[in-house]
Amino acid sequence: MKISVIIPSLNPDDKLVSVVDSLVKKGFEDIIIVNDGSDSAHLWPFEKVGSYSQCTILTHEVNKGKGRGLKTAFEYCLKNRQGYDGVVTVDGDNQHRADDIYNCCEAMVKNDKVVLGVRRFDGEDVPFKSRFGNNMTSMVFKVMCGLNISDTQTGLRAIPYRYLDTFCNIEGERFEYETTMLLEFKKSDIQFMEVPIETVYIEDNASTHFNPVKDSIKIYKVIFKYSFSPTVVKYILSSLASWVICLLYTSPSP
């Protein structure tokens, strides 16, 4: 497999080094880390992994958001990684195990689909805000967008190379970008599948830069904007018309 691992990172600690070490040990040979405007006190992890032959560091001088970080890496791969099977996006806080990352990449290559590494949210160690947020968003996705995705917040996503250009040209610069990516599955008829992964929360997910209020508002704004787009409204009306016709033809005669 020829895979680029993409890790967007803001103010990382030693967990980023642990993630990269585990990837190198697993045999990944191309790891792209995006420094999204980290402050001077948090540059040492980038300097550490930047010395590895497997790693490339891309830098934003100021913080631009996770979405822009992913786009920066996608654009880099389009220019410099032609002929690769694809990329896999990974969080830098050690929540994704190297074995799970490898399994998602294998599934992507075998099935030629986007692969989402999905967690279970019924364990006692899962923070309440993560369980509630994912369950709520999954329900909204299913009801309003017609997408059945069990883990809408997963950062572990293996993406075939041919989709990178599409994902470079969709809206979103921060956490809402990952939601827009999922909505693009339906809009552009992108095939996807889910692969179960280990559910890991370290220090109650304390290292996350996700703002529960501000970022959630942005995410739901994206979902509702999509839900009332002309394409989806047309789909809903078409489905409603089909349902009415079905009722008319299956109702017993008076």
Feature map (PLM): residue ranges:
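Conserved short acidic donor-positioning loop in nucleotide-sugar-dependent glycosyltransferases
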Residues: N11, D36-S38, K64, A73
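Conserved small/polar residues in nucleotide/adenosyl-binding loops
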Residues: Y249-P254
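Short beta-strand-to-loop acidic/aromatic patch adjacent to the donor-nucleotide binding site
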Residues: Y84-D93
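Short beta-strand/loop segment that forms part of the nucleotide-sugar
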Residues: E29-S38, L58-H60
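Short, well-formed alpha-helical segments that are part of the catalytic scaffolds
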Residues: N11-K25
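Acceptor/aglycone-binding surface of glycosyltransferases and processive sugar-polymer synthases
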Residues: E61-K64, R68-K79, A98-F175, I202-F210, ...
